[in-house]
Amino acid sequence: MAKANSSFSEVQIARRIKEGRGQGHGKDYIPWLTVQEVPSSGRSHRIYSHKTGRVHHLLSDLELAVFLSLEWESSVLDIREQFPLLPSDTRQIAIDSGIKHPVIRGVDQVMSTDFLVDCKDGPFEQFAIQVKPAAALQDERTLEKLELERRYWQQKQIPWFIFTDKEINPVVKENIEWLYSVKTEEVSAELLAQLSPLAHILQEKGDENIINVCKQVDIAYDLELGKTLSEIRALTANGFIKFNIYKSFRANKCADLCISQVVNMEELRYVAN
């Protein structure tokens, strides 16, 4: 769901292709767009993935909701965000369909699909998702570009879906609002160092409610009330602690939380910057 002002010249497009944008799998994938490069009308997010072992670039809360849902699904193997649809393919589709190709200052622009997903044990081995606010579907030009995108994936014989804010699970929305309603702590080395002791506590207190345990830890170590929960919140918001996004965070037991065991420090610094 690229925003306005993310246009590129032919030279810039060629450079991005040479850089490997939109290429690779898993931890080696490079998204066509990053949060630094695209103005956003809302919040953008950089979040670590347990599945891919890299930081993902999400341009809205709606993209985040879809990403967290995909991250939780055990059948999902790989998530590639901001996947480019190169003009070498889409230009001919536009001609055949009679739809004007996106052009800025005389240059055919690269369209992008928000997510290309690889799966196992599901109805599809691979599928694509475009994320849009429901209100955007009232715009005729938006619908035209979506039709180009639909035809692109149809030619590839890959199922393509549109996801809007109307489809957001209310519990998922609640969790996102709680995790990201205020600026979370940056992922410093000091904060990351808390993962190991937190993992021990979560294992030891497995059947107890996470909120109650956080209060117990604060009291036991004479910490400011809310300190432990704040650390868990920051680590969870940045993807280093995983939980069932379809269940209210406050209702989770300690055993419901999964702490990342492998963290790429270079990627970690990138999240914090």
UniProtKB/Swiss-Prot annotation:
Changing residue 37 to A: Modest decrease in 5'-cleavage. Pfam families: Tn7_Tnp_TnsA_C (PF08721), Tn7_TnsA-like_N (PF08722). Residues 90-108 bind DNA. The active site is at residues 63, 73, 114, 132. One of its GO terms (molecular function) is transposase activity. GO terms for cellular component: chromosome. It comes from the Bacteria. Mg(2+) 2 binds at residues 130-131. InterPro entries: Restrct_endonuc-II-like, TnsA_C, TnsA_N, tRNA_endonuc-like_dom_sf, WH-like_DNA-bd_sf, WH_DNA-bd_sf. It is an enzyme of class 3 (hydrolase). Its cofactor is Mg(2+); Mn(2+). Changing residue 57 to A: Prevents recombination, may affect protein structure. Keywords: DNA recombination, DNA-binding, Endonuclease, Hydrolase, Magnesium, Manganese, Metal-binding, Nuclease, Plasmid, Transposable element, Transposition. Its EC number is 3.1.21.-. Mg(2+) 1 binds at residue 114. GO terms for biological process: DNA transposition. The keyword Repressor does not apply. Changing residue 147 to A: No effect on recombination. Gene3D superfamilies: 3.40.1350.10, Winged helix-like DNA-binding domain superfamily/Winged helix DNA-binding domain. Changing residue 149 to A: Decrease in 5' cleavage. Changing residue 34 to A: No effect on recombination. Changing residue 144 to A: No effect on recombination. Heteromer with TnsB. Interacts with TnsC (via C-terminus); this interaction allows TnsA to bind donor DNA. Required for Tn7 transposition. Forms the transposase, together with TnsB. TnsA executes the 5'-DNA strand breakage reaction. TnsABC and TnsD promote high-frequency insertion of Tn7 into a specific target site known as att-Tn7 whereas TnsABC and TnsE promote low-frequency insertion into many different sites. This is Transposon Tn7 transposition protein TnsA. It comes from Escherichia coli.
